[in-house]
Design a protein with these regions (language model features):
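Ligand-binding cleft/hinge of the Venus flytrap
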Residues: 56-67, 159-185, 215-221, 296-304
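Short helix-initiation/N-cap motifs at beta->coil->alpha
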Residues: 72-83, 96-98, 176-194
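A bilobed periplasmic-binding-protein/Venus flytrap-type ligand-binding module shared by bacterial periplasmic
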Residues: 44, 124-136, 235-249
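C-terminal motif of bacterial Sec signal peptides marking the signal peptidase cleavage site
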Residues: 15-18
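Short beta-strand->loop
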Residues: 110-119, 179-182, 215-233
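An extracytoplasmic/periplasmic, membrane-proximal ligand-sensing/linker region
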Residues: 33-41, 46-57, 234, 240, ...
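A conserved helix-loop-strand patch within extracytoplasmic ligand-binding domains
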Residues: 116-172
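A ligand-binding cleft/hinge motif common to bilobed small-molecule-binding domains
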Residues: 94-107, 170-171, 197, 202-223
Length: 305
């Protein structure tokens, strides 16, 4: 009798077991094959913990919008982000202006598809330790006052933390050898603030949005460090997508990803949190041609061959 009951129970549960073993629609294709994860990444321009919090929320949103598994893969530095995009380890990457150009030049058909509302008119800020006696600068020619002082950029491949500040310095007639000692490369905008605030360098340059964000959150001691100049505007951060996603998912997948990014709504609390972490009110469309100035400057200072 017991064996009969067990047999009956097995027959009843078998269909449920078969159903539960099927992959869900987000991880399987129409023919039942496993779907490869859509991978996202970003240049590590800020504190890794902040980036992890941001991208965990974004991947959840994209997964729900796109109906495919989405995975965030952190990278160690700016060059690693470009390499990962080139070899296909990352499908969608949040690049700065320079790294975005570098990545697209290495992947035929790669597209810049979206940027924040602030990225069409982005700025770098030059900051100085208040004990340095470096005074606020009124125009680009005032950058000459930085000669003879120690100075740090951010990452060597940062648009707002290296490329454009070096460009404006050269426009003012300031060469890297005019600074005291070896020029610094802090590795991130947050680190630049910390080094100048601590007096390790008398001055530095970084992303304006990161500066404002850290000031607003009380992470900067304004008794020790201040902004001395804001650059003219330029195009900067943007999303770049690999064209191979069309083969893997669908012909319209690039358009679907772009639509999902543009759809982020500040009136929806969960989506506003994502936008706030990006320092944006919304995402807007962009295209490859917007970064022609960045490419020209990159070639001029030897960051693009």
């Amino acid at each position: 009798m017991q064996k009969s009951l067990l047999g009956l129970l097995f027959i009843v549960l078998l269909p449920f077991s078969a159903c539960s073993s099927q992959p869900n629609s987000a991880t399987s294709s129409r023919n039942g094959a496993q779907v490869q994860s859509f991978t996202t990444g970003a240049i590590p321009d800020q504190d890794p913990e902040k980036l992890q919090r941001l991208y965990s929320k974004l991947t959840d949103y994209l997964e729900a919008e796109l109906g495919v598994p989405v995975e965030y893969k952190p990278v160690t530095d700016y060059a690693a982000a470009v390499t990962a995009f080139r070899v296909g380890d990352l499908d969608l990457v949040w690049f700065g202006g320079l790294t975005g150009v570098q990545a697209r030049l290495q992947v035929d058909g790669a597209e810049a598809i979206a940027q924040r509302d602030i990225d069409a008119e982005f700025h770098t800020v030059f900051i100085a330790n208040k004990n340095s006696q470096i005074k606020p600068i009124q125009d680009i020619s005032g950058l000459k006052a930085l000669k003879g002082n120690t100075f740090t950029f951010g990452s060597e491949s940062s648009t707002s933390g290296r490329l454009m500040p070096q460009y404006f310095l050269e426009q003012a007639g300031v060469q890297l050898e005019d600074f005291k000692g070896k020029i610094g490369f802090s590795g991130s905008h947050d680190k630049t603030i910390q080094l100048v605030e601590a007096g390790s360098y008398k001055a530095g340059a970084l992303n304006e949005q990161v500066w404002k964000s850290r000031v607003n959150s009380g992470e900067v001691d304004l008794e020790k460090v201040e902004v001395i100049w804001q650059t003219p505007s330029y195009y900067d951060y943007h999303w770049v997508i690999n064209p191979k996603v069309k083969e893997r998912y669908s012909d319209d997948f690039v358009q679907r990803v772009q639509a999902a990014l543009l759809k982020l709504d500040p009136n929806v609390p969960e989506q506003k949190e994502i936008l706030d972490l990006f320092g944006a009110a919304k995402f807007i469309p962009t295209e490859n041609s917007n970064y022609a100035q960045i490419e020209a400057v990159g070639r001029k200072i030897g960051k693009i061959k």
